[in-house]
UniProtKB/Swiss-Prot annotation:
HAMAP family assigned: Maf (MF_00528)
Database matches in Gene3D superfamilies: 3.90.950.10
UniProt keyword terms in alphabetical order: Cytoplasm, Hydrolase, Nucleotide metabolism
Designated name of the protein: dTTP/UTP pyrophosphatase
EC number: 3.6.1.9
Source species of the chain: Pseudoalteromonas translucida (strain TAC 125)
GO biological process: nucleotide metabolic process
Enzyme class label: hydrolase
SUPFAM superfamilies with a match to the protein in the record: ITPase-like
CC cofactor: a divalent metal cation
InterPro entries, per database record: ITPase-like_fam (IPR029001), Maf-like (IPR003697)
Cellular component, GO, one term: cytoplasm
């Protein structure tokens, strides 16, 4: 095996971050049920999804090198916050994040036909107190619609962040250090 991988994700952010690692990859998307199971903890949920995405890539026939699956979830009060379904959902989410610290969990998994290895990276992010106008203006920008928790730290949403403790890149969607370390461990066997 070489350091080349498959990236089982349509995310342009994950593509960009994996490129930064200098790892050769081919990108494709998988169709996976991303529903959270009843009573499933956010940590278990995000890790299960990353593993599911990687294993789904293997099931599609991508078997000559490791398949990388990843998922990110924003958590506040031990509740997972998904991508906003509409402006009302988004407004409710950002009001919960406003003036508070939340966790961003990003899971990374590598899979082949005979093994799966995964890890979860947790980062604490603190938001300033947001006005209704800031929340509405941010929604109108179009940026929050496809983001877990309704914001992108690497874009306009970054201006709401007063403090971060952990991996910035995990919040964006792929923790660089941990991804590289996990791949090295995976390839060593």
């Amino acid at each position: 095996m070489t350091n080349a991988v498959y990236l089982a994700s349509a995310s342009p952010r994950r593509k960009e971050l994996l490129t930064q690692l200098g790892i050769e990859f081919t990108q494709f998307s998988v169709d996976a049920d991303e529903s959270q199971l009843p009573n499933e903890l956010p940590y278990d949920y995000v890790e299960r999804l990353a593993r599911l995405k990687a294993q789904s890539g293997v099931a599609l026939g991508y078997t000559d090198r490791p398949v990388l699956g990843s998922d990110t979830v924003v958590v506040i009060d031990n509740q997972s916050l998904g991508k906003p379904c509409d402006e009302n959902d988004f407004t409710h989410t950002l009001k919960r994040l406003s003036g508070n610290t939340h966790q961003v969990l990003t899971a990374v998994a590598f899979a082949t036909t005979d093994k799966v290895l995964s890890c979860v990276v947790s980062t604490n992010v603190t938001f300033k107190t947001l006005s209704d106008d800031e929340i509405h203006t941010y929604w109108q920008s179009g940026e929050p619609q496809d983001k877990a928790g309704g914001y992108g730290i690497q874009g306009l949403g970054g201006r709401f962040v007063t403090h971060i403790s952990g991996s910035y890149f995990a919040v964006v969607g792929l923790p660089l250090y941990e991804t590289e370390q996990l791949l090295q461990t995976f390839l060593r066997g």
